[in-house]
A protein has these predicted regions:
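Sec-dependent signal peptide recognition
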Residues: 2-8
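C-terminal motif of bacterial Sec signal peptides marking the signal peptidase cleavage site
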Residues: 14-17
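Bacterial signal peptide processing site
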Residues: 19-21
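N-terminal mature ectodomain segment of secretory-pathway/periplasmic proteins
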Residues: 31-32, 38-113
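Short, basic/low-complexity N-terminal boundary segments at the transition from targeting/disordered tails
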Residues: 43-51, 126-134, 183-198
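Intrinsically disordered terminal and processing segments
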Residues: 44-45, 53, 57, 89-93, ...
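Flexible, processing/modification-adjacent segments and terminal tails
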Residues: 106-176, 198-201, 259-263
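Gly/Pro-enriched, hydrophobic low-complexity segments
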Residues: 160-260
Length: 263
C-alpha cells in the first residue's frame, strides 16, 4: 500500500513538473509574440493611418487614369484583383501594356506580342513602379512589405514619424533589396517625403519632396521633386542635407491629368 502511495506521489510530481514546464514555455512563447507585435505594431499603425489619410478603403475599388511623362496609365482595383495598364503612341505604333494580377501582356496596334521572359520582367517592373509611386501608400500593406519604425524628427518646423521599408524576396519584385524611408506628417498623416536606395545600374540614393498635393474624389495624388544624394548616403541623413540645400535636384515626378473613371 505504501509502495502504491509512493508511486502515485512520484507520478503526480512528474505530471505537475511537466505541466509547470509547459505553462512556462507557453508564457515564454506568449511573451515573445507580444514583444514581436510591439516591435512592429507602431510602424504598421503609422502606415495604416497614412493609407486612411490618402484614400483608405476607396483604393479597394479605385479606377483612375493619369499621364506620366507622356504616357497614359490606368489602375483598376477590385478587392484582391487588379489591372494596371499603360498606353503610348510611338510613330505608327500604339503600344499597350497590361498587368492583370500576375500576368503581363503587351499589345502593339491591338496585336498581342510574344515576349521573352527578360522583357516581361523589365516591362512589368516598369509599369508596376509607376503605379506603386502614384498610389502611395496603398501598396505598403502588401504581405511582401517589411516595416520598421525608425524615429521621430522635425523637417522645416513640422514633425514626422519615420518608417523604414524593405521587401521580402518572394513577392518583392526584381528590386526587392531596395530600402525605403517614408516621412509621415504627424498632423495630416500623409507622406510628405520619401527616400530610397537602389542597387541596379551601379546603385543610387534618391530623396523626394511632395508638392501639388490634391484630393480627387477622396484619393490623394501628389507630385514630387526628385533629389540625388551621394552614393552610400544613409537615408536617415537625407532630411538634414535637404534642409541645408545639399541635395541635387534631378527631376520632377508629375502625375498629370488625373481622372476618376468611376464617375
Amino acid at each position: 500500500m505504501k509502495k502504491s502511495i509512493l508511486s502515485f506521489c512520484v507520478l503526480a510530481a512528474v505530471v505537475f513538473s511537466c505541466n509547470k514546464k509547459k505553462d512556462s514555455q507557453e508564457e515564454t512563447i506568449k511573451s515573445d509574440t507580444i514583444t514581436a507585435e510591439k516591435q512592429f505594431s507602431k510602424a504598421d499603425s503609422l502606415v495604416n493611418k497614412a493609407i486612411v489619410a490618402h484614400g483608405g478603403d476607396l483604393y479597394n475599388n479605385a479606377d483612375y487614369s493619369f499621364v506620366f511623362r507622356g504616357k497614359k496609365y490606368r489602375f483598376q482595383n477590385n478587392g484582391q484583383n487588379f489591372e494596371y495598364s499603360s498606353e503610348v503612341q510611338k510613330n505608327d505604333s500604339l503600344i499597350k501594356d497590361k498587368i492583370s494580377n500576375a500576368t503581363f501582356e503587351r499589345y502593339i496596334n491591338n496585336k498581342l506580342q510574344t515576349l521573352s521572359k527578360e522583357d516581361i520582367g523589365k516591362f512589368s517592373e516598369a509599369l508596376n513602379s509607376v503605379i506603386y509611386f502614384a498610389t502611395l501608400p496603398y501598396k505598403l500593406q502588401d504581405v511582401s512589405v517589411n516595416k520598421k519604425f525608425i524615429e521621430e524628427i522635425t523637417i522645416k518646423g513640422k514633425k514626422y514619424d519615420v518608417v523604414g521599408v524593405t521587401f521580402s524576396q518572394e513577392g518583392g519584385g526584381k528590386d526587392f533589396d531596395d530600402e525605403f524611408h517614408y516621412w509621415i506628417n504627424k498632423q495630416t498623416h500623409k507622406i510628405d517625403y520619401l527616400a530610397y536606395n537602389y542597387r541596379v545600374n551601379e546603385g543610387g540614393v534618391r530623396f523626394r519632396s511632395a508638392f501639388n498635393t490634391r484630393v480627387i474624389d477622396g484619393v490623394t495624388f501628389q507630385d514630387y521633386i526628385n533629389y540625388e544624394a551621394a552614393l552610400e548616403t544613409p537615408l536617415k541623413d537625407l532630411p538634414k542635407l535637404y534642409e541645408q540645400g545639399k541635395l541635387k535636384e534631378v527631376s520632377q515626378i508629375l502625375t498629370e491629368n488625373v481622372i476618376n473613371n468611376n464617375k
